[in-house]
Design a protein with these regions (language model features):
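Short edge beta-strand/loop segments characteristic of extracellular beta-sandwich folds
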Residues: 25-31
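Conserved, mostly hydrophobic/aromatic
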Residues: 28, 138, 167, 177, ...
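An acidic-aromatic substrate-binding cleft motif
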Residues: 114-178, 182-183, 220-221
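Aromatic- and acidic-residue-enriched carbohydrate-binding clefts of CAZyme catalytic domains
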Residues: 149-156, 187-255, 266-285, 396-399
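Hydrophobic faces of well-ordered beta-strands that scaffold small-molecule active sites
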Residues: 134-136, 175-177, 260-262, 291, ...
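Conserved alpha/beta catalytic core and glycan-binding cleft of carbohydrate-active enzymes
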Residues: 102-107, 112, 287, 300-399
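The feature marks proteins involved in alpha-glucan
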Residues: 1-23, 58-137, 145-149
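Active-site neighborhood of glycoside hydrolase catalytic domains
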Residues: 244-325
């Protein structure tokens, strides 16, 4: 089968690939691509269909901006190439090849073309003030994976949607989800192949212990191969339509008065512009209510002054509210918030009955900046669950 297509100029309004009725619009950066042939590898049903070379005349800086006029089909996937190197679209909205949790395919994951046909039914973020908020942090897979959850779609977005009545009974106003973007949960060990060589050469005695082959990154944080604009397919009852399943969950949460906050970790290798694009995308396409951001180089000044994010909760250990609002009046909607660990440790000492903690807790309760919210939490993923915290009065390590 031969693919018929034509290439014309595009519009540099946003990065990534956008599927349209008569083709695809591409705005994709190719760093260090001078003198190299760049383009797209198009696949149908897993087999290479076409190798499309991008003309240099459609290059702006490092970005190829063009439109490919072609007949689209539902099962198309793609990769990009730059010289001899192939890479997956870092702006991909759908990733194929990671549908099974903890299983790695030999092939590089490919991007698929997303269709924006979801009916939001006039849904919009809830904008609940911080002073009226009670957050409930959870892991989408872990929250309902056990049989005790009593849901039909355990460990999925659909399973979480079944627990909305339970969440309402708790009296919470928002769930804060650990990463739901397409992170790589498999952590390979570079020493594993070396250990195999030593074993095969009869030198296994030099190994103190057999090297582990791989481990699971359960939480989702880390610097592996991550696609921040794609929904985690392994978290869906129907992995082929994970994006739709998450949108259904968010729409149902909003109908029941519950916000959704997404935890996101960015390592220093991601640019400030990319981080902002990721957040804008999730607000625009998924109607999320906010983000809890982790990382050493999070551009809080840039994000805090972005007009597209003014109604979006932005939570960080240092939201830089003084710099964001310097010389400006108090914001009509406080979207910035500080998330620190001081309250967690002091609250535990207070519950234990340590001396001198009453005044400390009173000071925590009085903290209420006019510029930013203050998130007081007593447990998170770095330690006990809330149930464990209140179930024991002494250590039980011997058991």
């Amino acid at each position: 089968m031969t693919l018929e297509y034509s290439i014309s100029a595009g519009h540099p309004f946003c990065m990534g690939v956008m599927s349209q009725t008569n083709g695809i619009h591409i705005a994709m950066p190719f760093p260090e691509s001078e003198g190299k042939e760049c383009g797209m590898l198009l696949y149908k049903a897993g087999h290479e269909l076409a190798r499309i070379v991008f003309p240099e005349c459609y290059k702006m800086g490092e970005v190829y901006v063009l439109f490919i006029n072609m007949q689209m089909e539902a099962d198309y996937t793609y990769l990009f190439f730059c010289g001899e190197e192939q890479f997956t679209d870092p702006y991909a909205h759908i990733i194929r090849g990671r549908e099974k949790w903890g299983r790695r395919k030999e092939d590089r994951p490919r991007a698929a073309f997303a269709e924006d046909t979801f009916d939001w039914e006039d849904d919009m973020p809830l904008r609940i003030p911080y002073e009226d908020s009670v957050f409930y942090s959870l892991h989408v897979r872990g929250f309902t994976k056990h049989a005790s959850s009593q849901v039909s779609a355990r460990g999925t977005f659909a399973g979480l949607a079944e627990k909305i009545p339970y969440l309402q009974q708790l009296g919470i106003t928002a769930i804060e989800c650990m990463p739901v973007y397409e992170f790589d949960e498999i952590i390979p060990n570079p020493a594993y192949q070396e250990s195999l060589k030593l074993r095969d050469n009869g030198q296994a005695a030099y190994l103190e212990e057999p090297a582990w082959k791989q481990r699971i990154n359960y939480w989702g944080f880390g610097d592996g191969e991550t696609y921040y604009m794609a929904t985690k397919a392994a978290y869906a009852k129907d992995p082929q339509h994970a994006d739709r399943e998450l949108k259904l969950l968010i729409r149902q949460l909003h109908k029941n008065g519950i916000e959704i906050i997404l935890q996101m970790y960015f390592s220093p290798r991601y640019t400030q512009g990319y981080i902002r694009e990721v957040l804008r995308y999730w607000v625009s396409c998924y109607h999320v209510d906010g983000f809890h951001l982790f990382g050493t180089d999070i551009p809080m000044r840039l994000l805090g002054t972005d007009p597209y994010l003014k109604h979006t909760k932005l939570i960080h250990e240092n939201p830089e509210a003084d710099a964001v609002y310097k010389g400006k009046k108090i914001p009509y909607y406080r979207n910035l918030a500080c998330y620190g660990d001081a309250f967690r440790y002091d609250a535990r000492r207070f519950l234990k009955g340590d001396e001198g903690m009453l005044s400390v807790m009173a000071e925590h309760m009085r903290q209420n900046s006019s510029l930013e919210g203050v998130i007081n939490h007593i447990t998170d993923y770095r330690g006990f669950t809330l149930s464990d915290l209140v179930s024991y009065d002494r250590k039980h390590n011997e058991e």
